[in-house]
Amino acid sequence: MSRRAVYTGSFDPITLGHLNVMQRAKLVADELIVGLGVNAHKTPLFSVDERAELVERAVRAAGMQHVSVRTFEGLAVRFVRDCGARLIVRGVRSVTDMEAEFTMILANRKLDPEIETVFFMAGDEFSHVSSSLIKQITPLASDEELARFVPKEIIPDLRAKLAG
């Protein structure tokens, strides 16, 4: 039997930390679905379709197999169920991240007690990386510097979005 997991997030933009979580999630799942959430409370840099394309490009470049990208609106736990999965994958960088995730786990358990959440702690090299940081440093950093934080394949897209 195949084990399917879903890694949800906004991925705006995808970072090397996100890719690291995906690679590690593949250790516990045969198939990984990256669920790009549409959050009405956030103003994204990239549209959901652009984010999907960037994630697909980064996953391909990383050579990951059995990883697909889908978009969703609404509750993540419902999306996970609709995907036929029972595992939600989450990456955490800090105690603050864990506190927010803990609240979400409790809500998800009430909504669907059959769905479990698996956490992957960020490696030291990714514990400071966030999409917000990327947006802040892109106008100032060289491509070589940015490649320490994001897949090099998406740097031109970042530059185009954040130009001027």
Locate the predicted segments by residue.
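Nucleotidyltransferase catalytic core that binds NTPs
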Residues: M1-G164
